[in-house]
Amino acid sequence: HDVGQALVQHPLTRAVGFTGSQRGGRALFDLAAARAEPIPVYAEMGSLNPVFVLPGALDERAEALADGFVPSLTLGVGQFCTNPGLVFGLDDDKLDRFVSRTSALVEQAAPGTMLTAGICEAYHEGSSGVESLSGVAVAARTGTDVDRGKTQSQAIVFETSGTTFLKEPQLSEEMFGPASVVVRCKSKAQIQKIARNLEGHLTGTIHGTNEDLHEYAALVRILERKVGRLIFNAFPTGVEVCPSMHHGGPYPATTDVHFTSVGTAAIKRFQRPIAYQGFPDDALPTALRNANAGGIWRTVNGNVSRENAS
């Protein structure tokens, strides 16, 4: 903590990148804002990455959805920032099929070793707290005992109702590890109400059919305001480094919704724009001269090109 504080407050520091807890990221953000000359903090913090499994998808492939969900949940012992920590669906026999298959796979999963003893302890405390809540049940947990001395943890899937989820703030807190909560909603209206009440997250996922997308068009519009990456019929743990990737989201997922921490645009967090007006060509930086010596992509008079400018 002292080292982080010193780095943020050092006069030569011009910007800060951070991945960690909401408390840690907010502390650094506040320190940077309190400087005589404030600097930006690009903090990536907690995210539960909600997954919505819609009726058409569950009817067609409930078991296949579980086959994709459990590996995403347990990947890296649940320590990916895109770990799917919430699943929402209508409370019916189709969701029963998904939960049944998910439970069977989780029970067969092997315990995993977490990165540090502190992370492991926080995971056990968080999951135990959720388990103790009224109206929350354990659907499944890894069947093998763990060695806490080796920082091992079990995968756990909880179940609760939409009504309980709405009244229990703790269910909206990240359990950093292989744990997820399946929320059984009583209606489409309740699903939309829950979505409107969500905080900011890195990702949101919808599994559905084309018909589901039309039926739940309002849900898509709601999630557009809640997440940085909206996924259809896939799982959130795959994060490709490419120009189209946006790995960010509304607060408290990050402290600046406009930037990504993954992908080619990530470097823009640490650039400062400057415009040159009226300079002769030979006085400009090489990249801005008429002759494109480096053959780089440039925008000239609104057109993207590698050609020389006239």
What are these regions (language model features)?
Residues 148-151, 188-284, 307:
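C-terminal core of ALDH-fold dehydrogenases
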Residues 284-310:
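Extended hydrophobic packing segments that form well-structured cores
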Residues 79-81:
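Extended low-complexity, polyampholyte segments enriched in Ser/Thr/Pro and acidic residues
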Residues 18-20, 41-44, 138-141, 231-234:
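General beta-strand structural signal in soluble alpha/beta enzymes
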Residues 1-2, 13-14, 21-23, 48, ...:
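Short, glycine-/Ser/Thr-/acidic-enriched flexible segments
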Residues 1-71, 88-96, 305, 309:
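Rossmann-like NAD(P) dinucleotide-binding subdomain of oxidoreductase/dehydrogenase enzymes
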Residues 11, 15, 32-36, 49, ...:
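Structural signal for hydrophobic packing residues in well-ordered secondary-structure cores
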Residues 89-202:
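NAD(P)-dependent aldehyde/semialdehyde dehydrogenase
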